[in-house]
Amino acid sequence: MRTVCSSSPLPMRRRQSCAPALLKRSQAEPGNGALRRQRMLLQRAPICTIDAFCLDLLRKHFQALDIPPDFSPADPGSVELLRVSALSETLENAYRDPDFCAFADLYGKGRTDRAAGETILHVYDFLRALPDYDKKLDEFLAPWQDENGFAAICWHDLLLAEAARSARAAGELFRAALADCPGDREQELADAEEKKTPSAREKAKNAVLEKYTDAQERLDKAAALLGRVEQLAVAGEWTPLYDLLTPYVLGMEELPGLKGMKKRLNGEHKKVIRTRADEGAALFAQILELIPCSEEEAEADRRAAEPRLRALFAAVRDFDARFSAKKRDRKLLEFSDFEHQALRLLRDPDGTPTALCGVIRQNYAAVMVDEYQDTNALQDALYRCLASPAGDDLFLVGDLKQSIYRFRQADPSIFREKLDSWPALPGGTARPRPAEGTPGTDAMLALDANFRSAPQVVKGINFLFERLMSPELGDTAYGDGQRLVCGAPGEY
């Protein structure tokens, strides 16, 4: 069995947490030889971080790679100096390309090339979390060269999807602005009845009714507009959506909301009404920025962007080569180098497992990955190499709600994809082990029991997060499988 953890203090804690449990079980069953054997094997069990596993693999098989046998892990300080040096050389070479100059002019500010250099580093760092990242550059560039035009690139669908989400949220805000505050109108009508003369009372009541009728009509019109925006965005209708929004961009149509009349609302909930209307209007303004031009103009931009992107990707490749050479000259490897070189040992360029991979697999009855929500695509490829071809000996444990390492290129969507597609484990923990030679199936078992908190605490947490978390905010909906369940209610 191999257990892979994501950060350095975890392996020792995992080993220490298993030992007392095994001791307790073996004392309760003194005749159980299997438990005694597991206690002895625990001290030699390969529980480690993915970086430690890869480093050990490289030290044992360096001769199969183009790395020096006496390489050493690079410290952050020395690596940063090499990055700066490699980037400086890369920029000096890149500026000989007119297309890169055009890219730098587009992103740069003033006479500095800082933005261009930072973009090269951002793209490089992103790519290094992917397997076979050099091929990915060609894949990323291909849509910009596609004859199908603007609709072929990812931004077409992403912008429309974001416009649909914003329209849905804005529509809900406009609909709720007055709906949740029905008492305000009645209170103002009651105040109007306090006027001294019948004519004054009638005038005041008419003013109140006119004001709230006007507000409701504006909000209904805004909600209907946002509903149409959402409908077109979901359908992928860029041109009709742009045509619908253009009059608002040009000032030919009044922007949705309560502009000009918010000060006339004097009820108890006036701040709530104003806030919701303002937030809905702000979301509509964002939609105008998401769909800023016609499809023809966007296609012209795509054609202009393609040579600049090609020049940027060429600069990224050049930086990669220079940076790698500088590390190689000093016999240094970064943690990401460990993982990429380990993948070369375990998998051929076409994705076929190597002979060495088959040998290493034989050492493990199971591969268990903890903190899986903090995995990136490169690490996931390594786990797949270590597992059997059927993947029935690979166990992934994680919690999307605890994903906090995006800044280190962790990709929670890898875990979310499995949560969304894998069925629940039939029979739960009581499911019998499949017969030898029977192909396994991917399945998910929710470990949602909380043994640390009282029922009142669990209930309060669930109440908050059911309202706060969504796939867009928090990477997952707080529903079945994510909601906490009190594991020991009788102890409180």
Model region roles, listed by residue range:
Residues 4, 117-333, 348, 392, ...:
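Conserved ATP-driven helicase/translocase motor core recognized via long
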Residues 100-101:
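C-terminal helical "lid" subdomain and adjoining coupling/linker elements of P-loop NTPases
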Residues 118-125, 432-439, 443-492:
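Helicase-core coupling region on the C-terminal RecA-like lobe
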